[in-house]
Amino acid sequence: MSIIVALDAKSQYDALKIVEQLDPTLCRVKVGKELFTHEGPSVVKKLQEENFEVFLDLKFHDIPNTTAQAVCAAADLGVWMVNVHASGGRKMIETCVERLKAGNYQTQLIAVTVLTSMGREDLKDIGLDIEPVEQVKRLAKLTKESGLDGVVCSAQEAKILRELIGQDFSLVTPGIRPEGSNADDQKRIVTPKQAMLDGSTHLVIGRPITKAENPTEMLKSILASIA
């Protein structure tokens, strides 16, 4: 079990101010679209200089060759983990796996199933008249069959996916909120302890840590709750 701190920052300066208060031996960090678009690869390199392993959360989704090139570009940066959208299809994600293997990269590749902000009505709006958990199961199975390292899923789906896919597969879980935290824009949320019990391997936690008065103490408190 590991914690990935989502760096909810617009600038490299703000991101580095957050990680100044964190211990790289206790967590990894996630760089998302907003921060990466503002700062580019330099923010990844700066975080690595501070000894943090980086999950580059850009959710690539394009034609197979373009997506694979982007994934390999991320691997060239030395990131620990990168992700793609499983809904891009088998050919797209398998091409990414093949290119990473051909380049002898060690970067972990995972896939996004259904965004944690999406409910049944949201899926219906895009032509999928199905419960989110059923679509998650479909895409997780496709991801496993295609040779990826894991999926992003809500903790409420983790137990189901463990039974469906088995143990040798990472379940990276956003929507984690310690007891008493605001749900913000996440619809499918759960506590760190429950996520661990349900089979999640990596917990993505942002605002409860980054907006805390003392991020380090909050991180330690969360770690203690799942010890």
UniProtKB/Swiss-Prot annotation:
Q: Name one GO molecular function term.
A: orotidine-5'-phosphate decarboxylase activity
One Gene Ontology BP term is: 'de novo' UMP biosynthetic process
Q: In which pathway does it act?
A: Pyrimidine metabolism; UMP biosynthesis via de novo pathway; UMP from orotate: step 2/2
Gene3D superfamilies in the cross-refs: Aldolase class I
Q: Extract the SUPFAM superfamilies matched here.
A: Ribulose-phoshate binding barrel
Q: By its UniProt entry, which CDD domains does this protein fall under?
A: OMP_decarboxylase_like
Which residues act catalytically here? K59 (proton donor)
Chemical reaction(s) catalysed: orotidine 5'-phosphate + H(+) = UMP + CO2
Q: Which UniProt keywords apply?
A: Decarboxylase, Lyase, Pyrimidine biosynthesis
GO (cellular component) term, any one = cytosol
KW Lyase (keyword) present? yes
Query: Which residues does the annotation say bind substrate?
Result: 8, 30, 57-66, 116, 177, 186, 206-207
* EC number per UniProt: 4.1.1.23
Family as reported in the entry's similarity comment: Belongs to the OMP decarboxylase family. Type 1 subfamily.
Task performed by this protein: Catalyzes the decarboxylation of orotidine 5'-monophosphate (OMP) to uridine 5'-monophosphate (UMP).
Subunit comment for this entry? Answer: Homodimer.
Write down the HAMAP family for this protein, in alphabetical order: OMPdecase_type1_B (MF_01200_B)
Q: What is this protein called?
A: Orotidine 5'-phosphate decarboxylase
Name the encoding gene, please: pyrF
